Amino acid sequence: MAAHAMGCAAFRIFLQRCGINTQWSGFIHGAQRYYLNYNLLISNLDSYNILEIGEYVTFVDKDEEVKFFSTFSKNKKVLISYKDPLSMIRTILNANIVALNPCSKVINCSHLVENMNDLLKSYSRKYNKNNINEFDPYVLQWQMLIQESLLQYFRGCETYFLNMDDIKPQVCFSTLEKLAVYFGFNKPEISDQEFYKEKKSLATSYLLYFFPIVIRFDKCEIELNAKELTSKKDISKLLFEDVVVIDGHKICIHIDNIENLDQKILASMKKDISKVIEMLEEFIKTNKPLKEEDILNYLKHEKERRRIYREIIDFNLKTIKQHRPDIVASWKYYQE
């Protein structure tokens, strides 16, 4: 069981890498969600299947909600994830990136700087240090701080409380090894250790909106993306000695066909691609996201908002405070 702004999209990718069959149910109501879950469970009877529950506010009414949750067995193990509430609020604020002027993501190498400037100006973060007050804190209890509301339906289940700090790159692999033993799924492969150290979610990054960028050359075009495409060749190693990383994400440089690309053409392509990367890095460097300290500073000066946030947060932490006070104590910003 999870919620928005907790890193669960990346966690799902890690679980799938371990051979687990799972799918995000999204913002769908009870009957549709039941059908999706049922079909997921019977689609591969030989695999390790799990159901993911989040955003349950999408139920039409209370009766429908109760009916849906009554279909779950009470003798299954449950994993429920938690994160420092201030870090979670930071994530949801930073994930709000809005389109200003729709712009093509196709960059013509003959107008590269002009095209890139147009693209970079087409998006902006909705929230900054000066307008955090525009965010409605009650949204938290509808989509993000929902653990306490979910747990009421699983009181008899064996519950594993996961601190999402434990899927950060430096400890993610060992965490999955422990979870594999506890829940009985396949352990992550030793050869995959680097995979678990990579950032997987673009949710708070401008790259989610800028990518894929297509750079059009005279004889071909290439695509910059943070995803690996099996249908295209990644030529990043042909162009650069080191892995290309922007905003913490590994970047792939895809092309349909590498035939007829001599060293002269590759050198020219590298120059233009380097310029695109440079402009992306500079934009991200000068358009920094909010930090937890910014939110703490805002709440320090807004007494009524501070009361509302604390009331919502503390209600949602009742169970974990009872069973895993050590996790709550480890949250630096919540303690502040």
State where each predicted segment sits.
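Generic alpha-helical secondary structure signal
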Residues: 38-42, 60, 127, 131, ...
